[in-house]
Amino acid sequence: MLKVFTCPCRGPGPTGPKFTTFKVRGSDRDSADGQGDGDGPVIRLTSADRFVSPRTLPARGTVTVKNVADTIHFMAISPVKKGTTDKQIQAFFDSKAQVQPPFFLNGPSVGMDVLSPGRQLELTYKLPAGTYVLMCFIADDVTGMPHAFMGMHKVVILK
């Protein structure tokens, strides 16, 4: 399935609004079938507010991201220092520190916007090889706490 959208990307200028066209490819397949549309890895966003994914992902390529939860999620992929663990990340969030985490690195990151329950998308990216963390900062619909603070993060290696 291919949908083509045209939308204004800036307000009106001297010659009128500026428009851009983008294409979105989706699937008519049931997103709960356990398979991605391509041959690449699958990352699942779960109702337990966790990521289920391979520990190693490609540094460049396409992954299928499936929201198998009953709530919305999104995913950011951010670089962290080699050797960083999920336990360290959780300890930092639990500390409620107001400084940049000591394990975070400046560098390119990618992500996707909100994905509704039962939906999937193909995320294509190119990042330097290294250690990264997957995180979701959607606020919990009951507590208001960001999902990442509740444990929705996963350290992965991009090769």
Summary of predicted features, one role per range:
Residues 93-99:
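A detector of mature, structured extracytoplasmic domains
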Residues 34-62:
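N-terminal edge beta-strand
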Residues 74-84:
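Extended low-complexity, serine/threonine- and proline-enriched intrinsically disordered segments
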Residues 99-116:
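Extended, solvent-exposed segments with strong compositional bias
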Residues 1-30, 45, 55-58, 70-75, ...:
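Extracellular/periplasmic metallocenter environments
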Residues 65-69:
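Asparagine-centered strand-capping/turn motif at beta-strand->loop junctions
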